[in-house]
């Protein structure tokens, strides 16, 4: 008998997700059972945790399990647990809404590519709603531990759902799937055993299936519950007993990811610290990777008892893509997030797990370059944050970076700093790099001309974060990183000594020309000088080593912050015919127009834009006319 019944509309994002999910995930529809059993396992974990401080929540039944049964006549499949359960408010919150920030933006990002969408939806975590892949109606009966009032929730997965108060003798949740006619394959004990064995053998909660008992004459004598999984937490087992398939299925259970992980590390540590860790590197970036406020972190267990999801204190922010769990004996069972923040044991575990994660990435890079490239393409931008956040591991983090380079002639970021150092020319003392808005802009920068001529490799950095990265990463393997766009660029032993004498002569020859140009520009430029870094281009602009670069100024602007004005050094190529022609001009107006045009061209090459492009076009048309 139900009372206090009401019909409520789904949150708009739920309706959209249901429709997309049913169509996108149908090809792998059996995952609904994995998701529902995983939810039941989480409910048991939460009850164990709450019962630490309130044992009465067990209500005399501490044997936690999940049961799977079916009724061929009614066409229903039921997944029941005796975990924490839900009250009316929780049912509405958990089953009628999606409490994830950015959900609307995520759904809007989905398109018409079904394969890609299914991957994205899998990363988002479909959970309970996966029931609608195979059911045209879902009924939930639940009672929260320690409460007397139970709740009924029911929906056909369309625009609304019904919620009502009911009676339920036992705590926990029953999810009843009213299967579509074409999904009756799941009303088979053999099929259910197959799926549960495939997806849920690794979880610590016993999964029981209702089986038929027969007497000696082969007649049905009754029903019984049979445990069909190992029911031992995977991470507590010996590594040699666990197959790769089991590790991958546990990853999917843990992360609710739809894809296999790239690599994992399972470690048991005893001695000064006593813990087990299981860390995974995902293959695909989650849709909310760059939302630094989004929850992330490891699942925390203390003495095999679940404590919390997303324990972010055990992994630095730049490794927020890592998935996994930590089971430790060194923390109290009543530990809270606040206690974790200021705990010496936490700091020690964080340092150890960070090292473990970085070693795992090093192993992936060494053993499987193709897989590591997949990782880098997905998570490289986040890993780059590490050089500014983790001084102790800066060099190890930097060794994992990959860059585009003049050596590879490709925008693909495949070159490590160790690769670069191994190819350095004799006498080369620095690692040379160039930052730009894009790979194309970097590859075609006039600053590269001298380096291309001399065959010196330059790293081409075009990610927005790169200017910030090189501000924190000043050296690698004892070699300084040096921007080739700086006015005080020093090639050291790579410089051409014979040319230096002729350059001194040119300095005297062009002295009055430089003074004339400096007089015209006044305070607009820091100084006007001759340069010998160019071969085909008449002029470039550069900044001093201690001054803000163009890319850093753009980074400030992108963050809505006011940056100091960048004052450039204007460098002119004395061997270029255009510079020679301008130096010979006697008409002051003509001289000013030409030198301004060269400056605007140099600014355009450096910044990609001009403050007054119309004036530039007008001046160019005038001089070419």
From Swiss-Prot:
Residues 338-554 are annotated as: B. Residues 555-625 are annotated as: C. InterPro entries: HATPase_C_sf, Heat_shock_protein_90_CS, HSP90_C, Hsp90_fam, Hsp90_N, Ribosomal_Su5_D2-typ_SF. Residues 1-337 are annotated as: A. Disulfide bonds: none annotated. It is found in: Cytoplasm. GO terms for molecular function: ATP binding; ATP hydrolysis activity; ATP-dependent protein folding chaperone; unfolded protein binding. Keywords: ATP-binding, Chaperone, Cytoplasm, Nucleotide-binding, Stress response. The keyword Chaperone applies. It comes from the Bacteria. HAMAP family: HSP90. Molecular chaperone. Has ATPase activity. Homodimer. This is Chaperone protein HtpG. The lineage of its organism: Bacteria, Pseudomonadati, Pseudomonadota, Gammaproteobacteria, Pasteurellales. The gene is htpG.
């Amino acid at each position: 008998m139900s009372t206090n019944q009401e019909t409520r509309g789904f949150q708009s994002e739920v309706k959209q997700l249901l429709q997309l999910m049913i169509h996108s995930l149908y090809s792998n529809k059996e995952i609904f059972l994995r998701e529902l059993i995983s939810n039941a396992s989480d409910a048991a974990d939460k009850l164990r945790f709450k019962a630490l401080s309130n044992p009465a929540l067990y209500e005399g039944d501490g044997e936690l399990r999940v049961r799977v049964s079916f009724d061929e006549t009614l066409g229903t499949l039921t997944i029941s647990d005796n975990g924490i359960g839900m009250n009316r408010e929780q049912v509405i919150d958990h089953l009628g809404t999606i409490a994830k920030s950015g959900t609307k933006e995520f759904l809007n990002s989905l398109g018409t590519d079904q394969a890609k969408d299914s991957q994205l939806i899998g990363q988002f975590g479909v959970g309970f709603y996966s029931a609608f892949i195979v059911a045209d109606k879902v009924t939930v009966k639940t009672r929260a531990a320690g409460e007397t009032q139970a709740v009924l929730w029911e929906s056909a997965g369309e625009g609304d759902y019904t919620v009502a108060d009911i009676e339920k003798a036992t705590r926990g949740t029953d999810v009843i799937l009213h299967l579509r006619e074409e999904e009756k394959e799941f009303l088979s004990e053999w099929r259910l055993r197959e799926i549960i064995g495939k997806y849920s053998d690794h979880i610590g909660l016993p999964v029981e299936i209702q089986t038929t008992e027969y007497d000696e004459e082969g007649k049905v004598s009754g029903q019984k519950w049979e445990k069909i999984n190992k029911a031992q937490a995977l991470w507590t087992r010996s590594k040699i007993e666990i197959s790769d398939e089991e590790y991958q299925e546990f990853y999917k259970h843990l992360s609710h990811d739809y894809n296999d992980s790239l690599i994992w590390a399972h470690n048991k540590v005893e001695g000064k610290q006593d813990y087990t860790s299981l860390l995974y590197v995902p293959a695909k970036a989650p849709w909310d990777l760059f939302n630094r406020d989004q929850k992330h972190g490891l699942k925390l267990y203390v003495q095999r008892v679940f404590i919390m999801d997303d324990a972010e204190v055990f992994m630095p922010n730049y490794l927020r893509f890592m998935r996994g769990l930590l089971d430790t004996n060194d923390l109290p069972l009543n530990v809270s997030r606040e206690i974790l923040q200021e705990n010496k044991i936490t700091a020690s575990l964080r340092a150890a797990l960070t090292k473990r994660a970085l070693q795992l990435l090093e192993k992936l890079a060494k053993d499987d370059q193709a897989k590591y490239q997949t990782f880098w393409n997905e998570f490289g931008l986040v890993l780059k944050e590490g050089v500014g956040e983790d001084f102790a591991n800066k060099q190890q983090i930097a060794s994992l970076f990959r860059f585009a380079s003049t050596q590879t002639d490709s925008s693909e970021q495949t070159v490590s700093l160790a690769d670069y150092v191994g190819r350095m020319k004799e006498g080369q003392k620095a690692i040379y790099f160039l930052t730009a808005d894009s790979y194309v802009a970097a590859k075609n920068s006039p600053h590269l001309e001298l380096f291309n001529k001399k065959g010196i490799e330059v790293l081409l950095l075009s990610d927005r974060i790169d200017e910030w990265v090189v501000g924190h990463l000043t050296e690698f393997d004892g070699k300084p990183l040096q921007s080739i766009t700086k006015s005080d660029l020093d090639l050291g032993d790579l410089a051409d000594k014979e040319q230096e004498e002729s350059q001194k002569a040119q300095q005297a020859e062009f002295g009055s020309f430089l003074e004339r140009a400096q007089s015209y520009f006044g305070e607009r430029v820091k100084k006007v000088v001759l340069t010998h870094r160019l071969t085909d281009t008449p002029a470039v602009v550069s900044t001093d080593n201690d001054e803000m670069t163009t890319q850093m100024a753009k980074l400030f602007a992108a963050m809505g912050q006011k940056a100091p004005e960048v004052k450039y050094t204007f460098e002119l190529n004395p061997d270029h015919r255009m510079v020679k022609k301008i130096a010979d001009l006697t008409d002051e107006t003509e001289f000013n127009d030409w030198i301004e045009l060269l400056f605007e061209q140099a600014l355009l090459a450096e910044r990609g834009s001009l403050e007054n492009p119309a004036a530039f076009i007008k001046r160019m048309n005038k001089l070419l006319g």
